[in-house]
């Protein structure tokens, strides 16, 4: 693991950490059992194969 050569100030550390941002999940429209759903792209196969039930 990397070892820092110099101490980082609390301000610098917090400024760096504050830059991390989340991105919203990309939703795609699919049709399952006659219903149009907006689901995450990585779950499309699971919905089509029936691994995830479609709730009303």
Curated annotation (Swiss-Prot):
| GO biological process entries | translation
Q: Which cysteines bridge via disulfide bonds?
A: none
Q: Which UniProt keywords apply?
A: Ribonucleoprotein, Ribosomal protein
GO MF annotation list = structural constituent of ribosome
Which residue spans adopt a coiled-coil conformation according to this UniProt entry? none
Domain of life of the source: Bacteria
> Any signal peptide, and if so, which residues?
none
Query: Which stretches does UniProt call biased (Basic residues)?
Result: 1-19
Q: Which HAMAP family match?
A: Ribosomal_bL32 (MF_00340)
What protein name applies here? Large ribosomal subunit protein bL32
Please spell out the taxonomic lineage of the organism that makes this protein. Answer: Bacteria, Bacillati, Actinomycetota, Actinomycetes, Propionibacteriales
